[in-house]
Amino acid sequence: MDKAVSKTNRMAAEISQHGVKEYLAQQQHKGLLRFLTCGSVDDGKSTLIGRLLHDSAQIYEDQLASLKNDSAKMGTTGEAIDLALLVDGLQAEREQGITIDVAYRYFSSDKRKFIIADTPGHEQYTRNMATGASTCDLAVILVDARYGVQTQTKRHAFIASLLGIRHFVVAINKMDLLGFDEQVFNRIRNDFSEFVKGFGELDIHFVPLSALNGDNVVEPSLHTPWYQGGTLLELLETIDTQRELSALPARFPVQYVSRPNLDFRGFAGTLASGVIKVGDQVVALPSGKRSKVERIVTFDGDLPEVTAGQAVTITLEDEIDISRGDLLALPDSAPQVANQIIADLVWMDEKPLQLGQLYDIKVAGKKTQASVTAIDYVVDVNTLARSSAASVEGEGLGLNAIARVTLELTEDIVFDAYSLVRDTGGMILIDRLSNATVAAVMVVSGQHVSKQVSSPFSAFELEFNALVRKHFPHWQAIDISKLGA
């Protein structure tokens, strides 16, 4: 309670001393870190986040009062406060004592602002974990010191790596139950390091802690004199997760065309990577038409340049046809344009993947249709072994499966490899009937394939068939353009 009060008083004192504007400016200029917590069920993810918020003085009096009432009602921790209830918001989660949905929490320290994604540990909710990982820069992987590296721990580490996360903090929890044994810590560190050897270059930190008691979460523990590293909060504050997005090729996905009057036509969006300056020649893709940047417009006035992460409106010197879903880039570092891609895929639907079925696909504001035409191989996340498509023949690719696949699209899309630019290399597949997101797609490569074949059908019949398949997917009409003569 004292920490909550001191937090309130400290904020009031800072505002009184510096004024509201300066206080808000200080908060605005703090760096932002998005990270997720994941691991096997009951490793203590929600408790760890609750402890992190509590010990860093981020909980206020009304929250603590409510938490005490909820803890007494649940009775899971005796007379002590159940910090996991701060995060486990769904009624089903509280009753079962597990995390089902991805729970987001926000807090800040003196050095950084944080967005936490508390992801599920159960295997059937791995798809939720993939959703949380897709926007994070760092993963906190929890390991129960009693059990070591488990199957779900491996699955989460692999998915986090697959989704572009290169920074890991392995939090070895419940060390208090094993007397803070250094040998246990070293064994788990070696096991995890051995497993991720094939994941490429990773930045990994290990920390022994007790989320229940607070050891090495915010304050250093007296029980681990053999550990010379920082606490969990210190690591989160100091690990450099900047991707140097401004050094990457410029990518400006057009979110919408702004036309407030006849004298203004601009293209609004957020620069995903790189830098674009006034006067730069840009190419609009997939059309390939070129022009020069005339203005970079914001609410606060024009800018000479825009850097990655900024939301702006760009106007061009020439009137060229650009619409939502198109992309502006610099000609000497333009992305690829293709209608066939090879990608890693995480299947998120209970209904198995059907080869040849038409799905909606979205990437950087662009929406079109695609079908998976081949499964190149399936990945066993426990061993990272690759098995052929024959291993899922008949059953299809099931929930939580990970595979390398080939997709064919009904029209050209603009893309990068996911390892280069997340925003233009990450896609989602959507079931056209239920509108459910069924897969996360990370592009590896692509090519343009000519689809001109002799057909016994007239142009009208082909166009009418395409119209029916687009607007009446529940009719399950076949694509007659793929039928032979």
Swiss-Prot record:
<dbReference type="InterPro" id="IPR050100">
    <property type="entry name" value="TRAFAC_GTPase_members"/>
</dbReference>
<dbReference type="GO" id="GO:0003924">
    <property type="term" value="F:GTPase activity"/>
</dbReference>
<dbReference type="Pfam" id="PF00009">
    <property type="entry name" value="GTP_EFTU"/>
</dbReference>
<keyword id="KW-0067">ATP-binding</keyword>
<protein>
    <recommendedName>
        <fullName>Sulfate adenylyltransferase subunit 1</fullName>
        <ecNumber>2.7.7.4</ecNumber>
    </recommendedName>
</protein>
<feature type="region of interest" description="G4">
    <location>
        <begin position="173"/>
        <end position="176"/>
    </location>
</feature>
<dbReference type="InterPro" id="IPR011779">
    <property type="entry name" value="SO4_adenylTrfase_lsu"/>
</dbReference>
<dbReference type="InterPro" id="IPR041757">
    <property type="entry name" value="CysN_GTP-bd"/>
</dbReference>
<keyword id="KW-0547">Nucleotide-binding</keyword>
<dbReference type="GO" id="GO:0000103">
    <property type="term" value="P:sulfate assimilation"/>
</dbReference>
<dbReference type="Pfam" id="PF22594">
    <property type="entry name" value="GTP-eEF1A_C"/>
</dbReference>
<dbReference type="InterPro" id="IPR044138">
    <property type="entry name" value="CysN_II"/>
</dbReference>
<dbReference type="GO" id="GO:0005524">
    <property type="term" value="F:ATP binding"/>
</dbReference>
<comment type="function">
    <text>With CysD forms the ATP sulfurylase (ATPS) that catalyzes the adenylation of sulfate producing adenosine 5'-phosphosulfate (APS) and diphosphate, the first enzymatic step in sulfur assimilation pathway. APS synthesis involves the formation of a high-energy phosphoric-sulfuric acid anhydride bond driven by GTP hydrolysis by CysN coupled to ATP hydrolysis by CysD.</text>
</comment>
<dbReference type="GO" id="GO:0006790">
    <property type="term" value="P:sulfur compound metabolic process"/>
</dbReference>
<keyword id="KW-0548">Nucleotidyltransferase</keyword>
<comment type="pathway">
    <text>Sulfur metabolism; hydrogen sulfide biosynthesis; sulfite from sulfate: step 1/3.</text>
</comment>
<feature type="binding site">
    <location>
        <begin position="39"/>
        <end position="46"/>
    </location>
    <ligand>
        <name>GTP</name>
    </ligand>
</feature>
<dbReference type="InterPro" id="IPR044139">
    <property type="entry name" value="CysN_NoDQ_III"/>
</dbReference>
<feature type="binding site">
    <location>
        <begin position="118"/>
        <end position="122"/>
    </location>
    <ligand>
        <name>GTP</name>
    </ligand>
</feature>
<keyword id="KW-0342">GTP-binding</keyword>
<dbReference type="InterPro" id="IPR009000">
    <property type="entry name" value="Transl_B-barrel_sf"/>
</dbReference>
<keyword id="KW-0808">Transferase</keyword>
<dbReference type="InterPro" id="IPR054696">
    <property type="entry name" value="GTP-eEF1A_C"/>
</dbReference>
<dbReference type="InterPro" id="IPR031157">
    <property type="entry name" value="G_TR_CS"/>
</dbReference>
<feature type="region of interest" description="G3">
    <location>
        <begin position="118"/>
        <end position="121"/>
    </location>
</feature>
<dbReference type="GO" id="GO:0070814">
    <property type="term" value="P:hydrogen sulfide biosynthetic process"/>
</dbReference>
<dbReference type="InterPro" id="IPR009001">
    <property type="entry name" value="Transl_elong_EF1A/Init_IF2_C"/>
</dbReference>
<dbReference type="InterPro" id="IPR027417">
    <property type="entry name" value="P-loop_NTPase"/>
</dbReference>
<comment type="similarity">
    <text>Belongs to the TRAFAC class translation factor GTPase superfamily. Classic translation factor GTPase family. CysN/NodQ subfamily.</text>
</comment>
<dbReference type="GO" id="GO:0004781">
    <property type="term" value="F:sulfate adenylyltransferase (ATP) activity"/>
</dbReference>
<dbReference type="GO" id="GO:0005525">
    <property type="term" value="F:GTP binding"/>
</dbReference>
<feature type="region of interest" description="G1">
    <location>
        <begin position="39"/>
        <end position="46"/>
    </location>
</feature>
<feature type="domain" description="tr-type G">
    <location>
        <begin position="30"/>
        <end position="243"/>
    </location>
</feature>
<feature type="region of interest" description="G2">
    <location>
        <begin position="97"/>
        <end position="101"/>
    </location>
</feature>
<comment type="subunit">
    <text>Heterodimer composed of CysD, the smaller subunit, and CysN.</text>
</comment>
<dbReference type="InterPro" id="IPR000795">
    <property type="entry name" value="T_Tr_GTP-bd_dom"/>
</dbReference>
<feature type="region of interest" description="G5">
    <location>
        <begin position="210"/>
        <end position="212"/>
    </location>
</feature>
<feature type="binding site">
    <location>
        <begin position="173"/>
        <end position="176"/>
    </location>
    <ligand>
        <name>GTP</name>
    </ligand>
</feature>
